Amino acid sequence: MARVCQVTGKAPMVGNNVSHANNKTKRRFLPNLQNRRFFVESENRWVSLRVSNAGLRLIDKKGIDSVLADLRARGEV
């Protein structure tokens, strides 16, 4: 399963660890993904999504029905 948020599309990015001596080594910055279930009242069922914390905030702001409509338009869910 890819480490990608289903709502925002956030994915791992690449950067550097930087030591005190300014040595740089490659590392990955992973999105803060959570597996969450949301109850959709209009459909009277639960929907499971793998969302980042930013995606959870977006769902709180716009509502699960609006977010699901966007996902279905993109063909995600």
From Swiss-Prot:
Gene3D superfamilies: Ribosomal protein L28/L24
One example of a Gene Ontology biological process annotation: translation
Molecular function, one GO term: structural constituent of ribosome
Cellular-component GO terms for this entry: cytosolic large ribosomal subunit
Signal peptide: none
A Pfam short name: Ribosomal_L28
Record keywords, A-Z: Ribonucleoprotein, Ribosomal protein
UniProt family annotation: Belongs to the bacterial ribosomal protein bL28 family.
UniProt protein name: Large ribosomal subunit protein bL28
Naturally occurring in which organism (per UniProt): Cupriavidus necator (strain ATCC 17699 / DSM 428 / KCTC 22496 / NCIMB 10442 / H16 / Stanier 337)
